[in-house]
Amino acid sequence: MSTTIIGFPRLGEFRELKFTTEKYFRKEISADELLAAAKELRAKHWNIVKEKGISEIPSNDFSHYDNVLDAAFLFNVVPSSVRGLELTDLERYFALARGYQGEKGDVRALPMKKWFNTNYHYIVPKFEKETQVKLAGHKIFEEFAEAKELGLVTRPVVVGPFTLLQVSDFEDGVAPADFVDALATAYQEVFAKLAELGAKRIQLDEPSLVKDLSAEEKALFLDLYKKLLADKKGLEVLIQTYFGDVRDIYSDLVQLPVDAIGLDFVEGKKTLELVKGGFPADKTLYAGIVNGKNIWRNNYEKSLAVLEQIPAENIVLTSSCSLLHVPFTTANEEFEPAILNHFAFAVEKLDEIRDLDAIRNGQGAEALAANKELFATERVGENAELRARIAGLTDADYTRLPAFAEREAIQEEAFKLPALPTTTIGSFPQTKEVRAKRLAFRKGELSAEDYDKFLAEQIDEWIKWQEEVGFDVLVHGEFERNDMVEYFGQNLSGYLFSKNGWVQSYGMRGVKPPIIWGDVTRLNPITVKWSSYAQSRTEKPVKGMLTGPVTILNWSFPREDISIKDSTLQIALAIKDEVLDLEAAGVKIIQIDEAALREKLPLRRSDWYEDYLDWAIPAFRLVHSTVAPDTQIHTHMCYSEFTDIIPAIDNMDADVISFEASRSNLEILDELKAKNFQTEVGPGVYDIHSPRVPNEGEIDHTIEAILAKVPSKKVWINPDCGLKTRGIPETKASLVRLVEAAKAARQHLK
């Protein structure tokens, strides 16, 4: 038996890649300096994996922004709008991810979507009529050669052709089948070049195989691989799957002339059953047995019990998915040992994979004994009062009265807002000064009184600016918050916070998910102080800003000893108490963000309701069910595909919902219209994840497109998402255009 991982975190132990790349974006360092720093980081990571005793080391799992974008770039899947710009390869690459606005042109970034059921976001490739698929990139070869210079023969990794097609957009009437032959040829060219460089095996990531597959999709997969595998150019091929099981394609998959197949034994409900039914003796099974998505220690006894049932002769132990979904290492954390011993970040998961391999080979008795002792000890007690409160919930606790239509009329009279009311999603730019003041306060270098004074000044400044520009519903800006989940978690029992537990979310943005350690209750009011202060500074309504229970759960590392449903209901009751306190303090518009609602939606449609939506949607309703009819409840969702769960979203019974929409070309509007969506909506009118400022007239056209699909009385005008990560100049310029466009659109309604 040997060991490997599917992939390793990219940002670095201390987010070195993030800070270096941001310097490049600010033109503080050259492209050569960025590339040199990235090369140094890769070498460091390979060395860590090697020193941990992992026998097969992957390469090309590193990315300057996103691995799906890397694959698109490798195969020349670059939209004509970007291909025509006179830019360097690196500039063109980042233009696809971030947009480009300069002397050489003005192009929007490609859309961004959640990567399956994770909080990682990928850039969506675009296939057009003009797309000529061919081998165009060189990153995969350069990184293999780099590792070889260090004495390492790595296993190159690239997104497989089926998944590349499945996660892409197609325009101009083209379809995935149109690119099968060209993709097969291009992948074979990759095989040939890697074999020439000395590679032995390539990993083709095909997570799309774990979803529901139609007959057409199965045929596409088999056609691709029949052509692709007709000539492997002397290279061994591993088809690697993750995030679930491959029940729809298993019988075909095991008959393909591949050398190895990677299966997920953590999230794959039927993986063990499939393998026990037979696995080819001439293939190697890469068994994903260590959870790549959560931070809890692996229970060796349970993992070994699974491994003992696998009939395959040739097994490589691996992670269930890439380790980019967990933090780098626990070595920099300050938890007491009794807590820290329960956690395994990426580096520690290497130890776990090696331990399991050693135990299987009769050499890991000490590691097994220590692991047994860890799991034999009760980790945390339960809150009996909270458990009783949840047990006592009835249907009435999940139902808001009066019904939506009656509330809508009451709120229209209460707020007297103009047509197409304008607002933002919540946060304003967090400047260096804001971050420095927060850090100084945390370190005790700034008094609470001085910090509060600073925050009040920030709120005053932005409330005044919003009034001057002409916004209808204001926000306080969230200057007191570092992260929309961590901020709440710090005021909830049962939560722990890592010091350096950063995980890549999109591009160079990292998030630091808190850890749900025990039962969750609210310790004290969380947002009332600054929301009520902001409301006192203006006659216009100011939104109270909360993070919803499902998003708090999905953006945390959840417990594994109780169900995520039970954890979510605990959080929902805590946020419900906060909602009622805000309402009592005079805050009459309350936004409860559910940005991550889609994130843990099962990948198979048959599991959507029973396993998730049947409790996730009621958990949201529980939060706001007892507010007064003249209190308006907003929610916000971003960067996921929502079109197929529109009825469930309407069933959340919010009064207003804002969606990410501009970057995905307002695709959601047709579905809202088709499903007769009742909730008032704010489809984002410009993309905040790109630094470019919308052109004059751009937002006007977007509003026009929205009004063609949604009745004007149902429409709100807002950006795609919060503005925390943007700069002040671009933010103000964009928001001024937003308000001007809304005012112009109102004139056309008259």
Curated annotation (Swiss-Prot):
Binding-site list for L-homocysteine: 425-427, 478, 593
Active-site residue list: 689
Binding site for L-methionine: 425-427, 478, 593
EC number: 2.1.1.14
Residues binding 5-methyltetrahydropteroyltri-L-glutamate: 15-18, 114, 555, 599
Pathway: Amino-acid biosynthesis; L-methionine biosynthesis via de novo pathway; L-methionine from L-homocysteine (MetE route): step 1/1
Cofactor: Zn(2+)
GO molecular function per UniProt: 5-methyltetrahydropteroyltriglutamate-homocysteine S-methyltransferase activity; zinc ion binding
Signal peptide stretch: none
Keywords on record: Amino-acid biosynthesis, Metal-binding, Methionine biosynthesis, Methyltransferase, Repeat, Transferase, Zinc
SUPFAM superfamilies: UROD/MetE-like (SSF51726)
Cofactor annotation remark: Binds 1 zinc ion per subunit.
Domain of life from the UniProt record: Bacteria
Binding site for Zn(2+): 636, 638, 660, 721
Cystine pairs: none
Main EC class the enzyme belongs to: transferase
PANTHER family with a match to the protein in the record: 5-METHYLTETRAHYDROPTEROYLTRIGLUTAMATE--HOMOCYSTEINE METHYLTRANSFERASE
HAMAP family noted in UniProt: Meth_synth
Role summary: Catalyzes the transfer of a methyl group from 5-methyltetrahydrofolate to homocysteine resulting in methionine formation.
Family, per entry: Belongs to the vitamin-B12 independent methionine synthase family.
NCBIfam families: met_syn_B12ind, PRK05222.1
Protein name (database record): 5-methyltetrahydropteroyltriglutamate--homocysteine methyltransferase
Organism: Streptococcus gordonii (strain Challis / ATCC 35105 / BCRC 15272 / CH1 / DL1 / V288)
Protein's gene: metE
